[in-house]
Each structure stands twice: as C-alpha cells, then as structure tokens.
Amino acid sequence: MPIRIDTASADFTQRFNAFLTMKREVAADIEAATRAIVDDVAARGDAALLEATRKFDRLDLKASALRVTPAEVDAAVAACDAETVEALTFARDRIELFHKRQLPKDDRFTDALGVELGWRWSAIEAVGLYVPGGTAAYPSSVLMNAVPAKVAGVERVVMVVPSPDGKLNPLVLAAAKLGGVSEIYRVGGAQAVAALAYGTATIAPVAKIVGPGNAYVAAAKRQVFGKVGIDMIAGPSEVLIVADDSANADWIAADLLAQAEHDANAQSILITDSERLADDVILAVEAQLTTLPRAEIARASWEDFGAVILVETLDDAVPLANAIAAEHLEIMTADAEAFSLKIRNAGAIFLGGHTPEAIGDYVGGSNHVLPTARSARFSSGLGVLDFMKRTSILKCGPDQLRALGPAAMTLGKAEGLDAHARSVGLRLNLR
C-alpha cells in the first residue's frame, strides 16, 4: 500500500520530511566506468565507438554504417501504422505552435547618457539529441526535443539512438523525420554522448546535448558538461494530484497509474481534503491494476513510492505542493485556476478534471521534458530558450566614454587591475 499521511497527526512534519527525502534510485558507482568510456571515445574516436557498440549493443558495424540513411528512414516511415504517424504529425504541429510563442525578441535602446545597449538572440549551431533504445524508445520524446530546437533555429540536430541487435524503432525514425532531425546515428550509451561532445571522424561534435537516458548516459552527460551544454539530469517521473470532493476518483486513479506504469521508481501522489475521496481512489487504483498490461511495474511504483496525503483544508495543500515541486501537478478542485495561482514550484500544471497529464505527454503542445526530483524549485521544462543564446551589445561614443570612464577607472584601480583603468584612460588622455 502507498504511504498515507495526515496533517492532523502529531508526527506529520517528521513523516512528510522523510517522504520528501526518500531515494527512488539506487546510486550505482558507475562514474569510473563511464569516465573510461568517455575518455576512450575522446581519444580514439570511431574505433572506440564501434568497440563499445559491439560490446553493449551486440552490433558489429563499420564506421560507414553508423549513420542511418535517408532511405532507411523513409522505409521505416512507410512501415509505420498510418494512424500513428498521423497522430505524431498532429502532435508535432501543436508542439511547434506552442513553442513558436516562446521565441524571444532582440532589443536595442539608448539610455539617458546616450549609451547604446541591448541584446541579440541567436540559435545554438548544433545540438545532439539522445534517444533511449528498446522499450524506453518514445517517439513523442523525439518531437519534444527536436521541434523546439528547430523552432529556435538550430541548423543541425543530431540524433543518436542505440539499436540492440541492429533493431531500431520505426516510430522513432518517423518522429525524427517529422521533427526535422538532420542526422541519425545508430549508437547509444555513454559512448554516444562522448561522440557528440568530442566528435569522431564520422560524427561531428555538437554544442549541446539533450534527451533522457540510463544511469550511464546521465553520468556521461555530467562528465562532458563544460565541453558542451546539457539540458538536465532527469530522474524518475512523478505526478502530484491535488483534489477535493468534487473530483472523480476513477479519473484520479487512472492518472496516478499513468505515471506509475512508466517505471517502478516513478512516483504518484494524491493530496486531498476529503477522506472519502482518498479511500475511493485507493480502491479505484486496486481495481484498475487488475486490467493494466504494465500492472507489475505500476504496482511496484504505487506500493513503494506512492502517497496519499490528507489535509484539513486545500490551503494546507499549497505549502506541501510547493515543497514537493512535482514534475507534473494536476489540480482537480472546484476552482483549479485559483489554486494554481498559489503554486510556485511545478514543472507543468494541468488544470481541471478534463486535463489529464497524458494530454501534455503527447498532444497538448507544451513540452513534456520537465524537471524531476524537486528540481522544479529552480528550473523549468525544456523550451526554445534552451536552444538559444543571448549576446549583450554595448556602444559608446566619445561623449559617453567621458561620462562613464572615470568611474570605470576608479573601480579598475580599486580591484588592482591597472590595465583595465589604463585601457579607459588612454582613450580619455588620462594617466
């Protein structure tokens, strides 16, 4: 059974804090093994990449076969179910529409002294997209990463995807084509991350790497950060549902299980001011588990990491929700909009009973790449700005330099940086 906590209990604070800090992943000691792979690819390029692919993916390739050809992509698209491709196209269009509204504007202005200031936005030149292989290969995630990059103006989007025993998910290739991916390589793991960061004879390096992966991929992303940018280190998925007595218990149960079926380490939480609703939801979860194909995974998640938290009033739920800082926050209350305005920390908010989180996963248009493990306290979901850079612009004429220069010289000397002061003073004929 999931943990059940009541704010009326004397030990609530202690139990809630323990719940907040519980670990949902076993931290394996893989840093050294990952470092060896990354360093090997950085040093030996394609040779190391091909060796690792033989070892981990049981795939013996030559460098010339690393890249998935356009003909292979077209054949994969043709082999896909037409209705699914149509749904992916529909999702792509909505994701594009949403993210176009995020495009920032350049600005240039002149202040009271006549100094020209401003900034200019530009797209990152090349981005690498890591896509997991096997059962975790989700075509929707390809769209969520690739489409914002293309909207931002990224010229080269490079996808790497492992192909265990030579098998690639056709829908992943279809999504790559729909999303505007420029190049696709059949490699995965830490070795693929290293190839994107350092480059090989076959794979030209990129400037930023995005996309989820296993523990080795996450470790490799951490290790190459600084050489390239990265998006985030994603943890297990999570949903928090805040509901009152007006909510439908079956709908809540379905949404809790939709998160739980992702991964045994996923987390599903309900906060409610209704004990009746809490009881009904727990019963509904048990009933729905009996017909769920991924019931074993979902049950493990629900029983090990699920939670039902009872509060006296919905106002009591606000600080709890902000402390949890969930990846997904569903609000099923009589006035969901009003409650949402009190929330500071959430990756994405889903308002009302007719907005299941699954809509956001696929076709809502907003991005489903969101901060996990309470990182919504300080970070945001993936968007257009993750693929862009802002460059500041400053222009002074002689009059403006005379107005600003003396203060700059004073500060340069105060910091012991005499050459800074001199670079201004020479222009002002001051020593």
How should these model regions be labeled?
Residues 180-267:
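Conserved NAD(P)+-binding/catalytic subdomain of aldehyde/semialdehyde dehydrogenases
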Residues 3-8, 183-188, 308-313:
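Short acidic-hydrophobic, aromatic-tinged amphipathic segments that line or gate anion-handling sites
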Residues 1-125:
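N-terminal Rossmann-like NAD(P)+-binding subdomain of aldehyde/semialdehyde dehydrogenases
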